[in-house]
Design a protein with these regions (language model features):
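Basic, polyanion-binding surface patches
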Residues: 2-176
Length: 176
C-alpha cells in the first residue's frame, strides 16, 4: 500500500484554479474602471449572492465603497489579454476600455457599464463590506445576469463550455 508523505506549509491560499473575472466599477460622477479579480465566487443561491475581494490601495476600491455597485464580466479566451492588461495597469490615469478596445454597454440594474465582449455579465449591488486584512470583501446581491445568446442550446439551456472561460492558477491563465 502506497503512503503519501506530506509537508506542512504556513497558512496560504491553495484553492486553485479560481475564476479570473473583469469587474467594472464606477464612482458617483460616472467615471468608470475595469479591475481584474481572482478572489470571487458564489456565497448564496437564494437570494443569489456573490463577492469580490479588493485591496484597499486599488484605484477601484473607493469606487466600490462610494457607488456600492459593480458588474462581474466573465472572461473568455478572446478577452483574456485585455483582462490581463487590466490586472497590471491602474485606471487612475488610463481609460482601460479605450486601452483594451473593450466596449462599454449599459447595464440593466446598476449604474456601471458592462463589458459587451464578455459572454456573461453579472450585475451586483453591495450589501456588506467586510474588512478582512489585505483585502476588503464586497458581499453583493446579484440583480441581473446577461448571457450571450450563442451560449444557449435549442431549449434555452446555458452551455458555458462554449464560452471558453478563463481561470487563474499560480500566476497562469487556463481556459476551460
Amino acid at each position: 500500500e502506497k503512503t503519501m508523505s506530506k509537508q506542512i506549509w504556513k497558512p496560504g491560499n491553495m484553492l486553485y484554479p479560481v475564476p479570473a473575472v473583469l469587474v467594472s466599477v464606477a464612482d458617483s460622477e460616472g467615471k468608470d474602471n475595469l479591475i481584474t479579480i481572482a478572489w470571487t465566487g458564489t456565497v448564496c443561491s437564494d437570494p443569489a449572492m456573490t463577492y469580490i475581494s479588493v485591496r484597499k490601495e486599488r484605484y477601484s476600491h473607493h469606487m466600490l465603497k462610494e457607488n456600492k455597485e459593480f458588474v462581474i464580466n466573465l472572461v473568455s479566451k478572446e478577452i483574456c489579454r485585455a483582462a490581463d492588461f487590466c490586472g497590471v495597469r491602474s485606471g487612475r490615469d488610463l481609460d482601460k476600455f479605450e486601452a483594451t478596445g473593450l466596449t462599454r454597454e449599459k447595464a440593466s440594474t446598476v449604474n456601471v457599464p458592462l463589458v459587451k465582449e464578455s459572454p456573461v455579465n453579472i450585475e451586483c449591488k453591495v450589501t456588506q463590506v467586510l474588512e478582512l486584512g489585505s483585502h476588503d470583501m464586497f458581499l453583493a446581491k446579484v440583480t441581473a445576469v446577461q448571457v450571450d445568446e450563442s451560449l444557449l442550446d435549442e431549449k434555452g439551456k446555458l452551455d458555458l463550455n462554449k464560452a471558453h472561460l478563463v481561470a487563474y492558477s499560480h500566476g497562469e491563465y487556463q481556459t476551460f
